[in-house]
Regions:
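N-terminal, post-signal-peptide region of Sec/Tat-exported proteins
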Residues: 48-78
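OB-fold/S1-family single-stranded nucleic acid-binding modules
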Residues: 115-132
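Beta-strand/loop nucleic-acid-binding surfaces
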Residues: 84-97
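N-terminal signal peptide c-region/cleavage motif recognized by signal peptidases
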Residues: 20-21
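Short nucleic-acid-contacting surface segments enriched for D/E, G, S/T with interspersed K/R
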Residues: 94-109
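Short N-terminal segments immediately surrounding and downstream of signal-peptide cleavage
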Residues: 27-42
């Protein structure tokens, strides 16, 4: 019996290692993208780390809140040699999330309508978005 266990132990161990999920230690997600429709509605998504490390030298994104209470999202996205600028002001429902967006280090998606009102803000956090 001991001989059989000794024979099968390496096989079972190898099978367990192969079946184990990957830990993804050190994995980082860096993405950045913005678009604008013909009616000036549009959206941006990615992470602030992704915008900072984007290959376009003029690419950036930030959430702002002034002392007066005014809130804005501003971004620039460079594709090739063309930089396009984006901005929106949150509506009442989206403005509630602004304090979270100000400290957010993960993935975000923000959409705005043709009048420039941010009507949707999606925030997703995870270790793969942080630069530790």
């Amino acid at each position: 019996m001991k001989r059989i266990l000794k024979t099968w132990t390496p096989v079972v161990s190898l099978a367990a290692l192969v079946a184990a999920p990957a830990a993804l230690a050190g994995y980082k997600t860096e993405s950045a993208y913005c678009y604008k429709n013909t009616d000036n509605s549009g959206g941006c998504y990615g992470s602030l780390l992704g915008f900072r490390n984007h290959s376009g030298s003029n690419t950036y994104a930030y959430f702002t809140q002034y002392y007066s209470g005014s809130k804005y999202f501003n971004a620039a996205y460079t594709s090739g040699t063309t930089t396009t600028y984006f901005s929106c002001t949150p509506n009442a429902a989206t403005a509630v999330q602004w304090p979270k967006a100000m400290n957010h280090q993960g993935y975000f998606t923000v959409y705005w309508d043709a009048s420039g009102a941010c009507y949707s803000l999606y925030l997703n956090n995870g270790s793969q978005y942080s630069n530790f």
